């Protein structure tokens, strides 16, 4: 009987200890949960405060792409590559929302690449059988298609530029005001700026004298070409000439100076950066633009072997072009490609 009592007392004590332990654990857990909740509420409040600060900061400051207090920039990009001509068009469309101006505003930056397509060819049927085709001219053409409500108001570059590097900045200020300067940099904290910068060693950029409010054209034309220790004008028949005694019809490249010496625009190609500033009457919802990139090629013809014959130069003998039509939706600020075609044997000819 005594043993039974002892067992009951021990059992009761065990239960009491277990209950006390469980209560302590629950209390500790509740206390920890309370601490975690307080910590979470503190973090949430801190995050909300930071978010409010960021939001207020965004509302009260002018971002780099803003125009004044309520202006806004919407950017679109379209890229078209044509394998046949090895020409790439990359166009940036910057829509400017300016509540102080009664027209739509658009900046179009024409970029991409026009590969040189430098070629050495053999033509056995001719006396001067070794040919070099090189890019003597690059052309970029931009026109508004049959829409008098959209006008070109400015362009970069302007006139003729002969420096090895071209840098210019276009600036737009609220109210439709615009300006352009040489070099790179912003003119005002309340203006939106766009820069162009490209290399054209041994070439000149010429803006066509026939440009108007619906059509602009730029030509990048070879001038005095430097290669190795030589400097020869584009009009010189001896340009890139090499002693042809070691050359054969099978190796036309040996009739000309080593191509690694050629200027970059001859050897590799041209990367244009041209800018057009346009305005559009708000009653007009859509406008189409036609953009053409063209490569003109001169052909230099030399006769291989020991029998000398004067070199032959044929200017603008060949050419390839890529023509793309883009459509701008002014209301939705979108751009799409609606047509594209390319062709060979189409060198650009002004007129």
Swiss-Prot record:
Taxonomy, superkingdom: Bacteria
Signal sequence annotation: 1-27
Any GO CC annotation of this UniProt entry: extracellular region
Keywords: Signal
Compositional bias of kind Basic and acidic residues: 30-60
Keyword Acyltransferase: no
Protein name: Uncharacterized leukocidin-like protein 2
Record family assignment: Belongs to the aerolysin family.
Ranges where the record places region Disordered: 27-71
GO biological process: cytolysis in another organism
Chain segments annotated as transmembrane: none
């Amino acid at each position: 009987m005594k043993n039974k009592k002892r067992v009951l007392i021990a059992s009761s004590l065990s239960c009491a200890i277990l209950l006390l332990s469980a209560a302590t654990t629950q209390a500790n857990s509740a206390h920890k949960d309370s601490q975690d909740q307080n910590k979470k509420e503190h973090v949430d409040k801190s995050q909300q405060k930071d978010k409010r600060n960021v939001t207020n900061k965004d509302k009260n400051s002018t971002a780099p792409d803003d125009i004044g207090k309520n202006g806004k920039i919407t950017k679109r990009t379209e890229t078209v590559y044509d394998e046949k001509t090895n020409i790439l068009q990359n166009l940036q469309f910057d829509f400017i929302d300016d509540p102080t101006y009664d027209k739509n505003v658009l900046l179009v930056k024409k970029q991409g690449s026009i590969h040189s397509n430098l070629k050495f060819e053999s033509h056995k049927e001719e006396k001067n059988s070794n040919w070099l085709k090189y890019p003597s001219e690059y052309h970029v053409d931009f026109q508004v298609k049959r829409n008098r409500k959209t006008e070109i108001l400015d362009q970069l570059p302007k006139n003729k530029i002969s420096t090895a590097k071209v840098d210019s900045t276009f600036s737009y200020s609220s109210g439709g005001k615009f300006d352009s300067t040489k070099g790179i940099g912003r003119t005002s904290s309340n203006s939106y700026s766009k820069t162009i910068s490209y290399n054209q060693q041994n070439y000149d950029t010429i803006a066509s004298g026939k440009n108007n409010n619906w059509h602009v054209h730029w030509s990048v034309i070879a001038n005095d070409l430097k290669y190795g220790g030589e400097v020869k004008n584009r009009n010189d028949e001896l340009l890139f000439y090499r002693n042809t005694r070691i050359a054969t019809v099978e190796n036309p490249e040996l009739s000309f100076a080593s191509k690694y010496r050629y200027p970059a625009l001859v050897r590799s190609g041209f990367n244009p950066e041209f800018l057009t500033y346009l305005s559009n009457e708000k009653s007009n919802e859509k406008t189409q633009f036609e953009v053409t990139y063209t490569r003109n090629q001169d052909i230099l013809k030399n006769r291989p072997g020991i029998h000398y014959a004067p070199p032959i130069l044929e200017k603008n003998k060949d050419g390839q072009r890529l023509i793309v039509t883009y459509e701008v939706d002014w209301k939705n600020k979108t751009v799409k490609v609606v047509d594209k075609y390319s062709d060979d044997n189409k060198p650009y000819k002004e007129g």
